[in-house]
Amino acid sequence: MANSLRGEVLTLYKNLLYLGRDYPKGADYFKRRLKNVFLKNKDVEDPEKIKELIARGEFVMKELEALYFLRKYRAMKQRYYSDTKV
C-alpha cells in the first residue's frame, strides 16, 4: 500500500474511532465492529480498491455525523415543544 493511502486509511480509522464514542449501541460495540472491518480488508493491495474502501468509510463518517446531529435536534425539540394538544 502506498504511503499516502496508508496515511489516509489511518486518518479515516482515527476519525471513525472518535465518532464511535457516541454511537447509540455503545463505544465498545462500535470499536469492535470497526476493528473487524479494517482487519477484514487489511490484505487489499489494489490502490483503486483501497480508494473505494476509503470513500465508503468517508460515507459512513458523514452518516454518523448526520445521525448525531439528528439525535441532538430531536432532544432539543423535545425540550422546547411539548406533544400535548390543547
UniProtKB/Swiss-Prot annotation:
GO terms for cellular component: mitochondrion. Its main location: mitochondrion. Transmembrane segments: none annotated. Pfam families: Complex1_LYR (PF05347). Keywords: Mitochondrion. It is found in: Mitochondrion. GO terms for biological process: negative regulation of oxidative phosphorylation; respiratory electron transport chain. It comes from the Eukaryota. GO terms for molecular function: enzyme inhibitor activity. CDD domains: Complex1_LYR_ETFRF1_LYRM5. PANTHER family: ELECTRON TRANSFER FLAVOPROTEIN REGULATORY FACTOR 1 (PTHR21024:SF0), GROWTH HORMONE-INDUCIBLE SOLUBLE PROTEIN-RELATED (PTHR21024). Acts as a regulator of the electron transfer flavoprotein by promoting the removal of flavin from the ETF holoenzyme (composed of ETFA and ETFB). Belongs to the complex I LYR family. homotetramer. Interacts with NDUFAB1. Interacts with ETFA. Interacts with ETFB. This is Electron transfer flavoprotein regulatory factor 1.
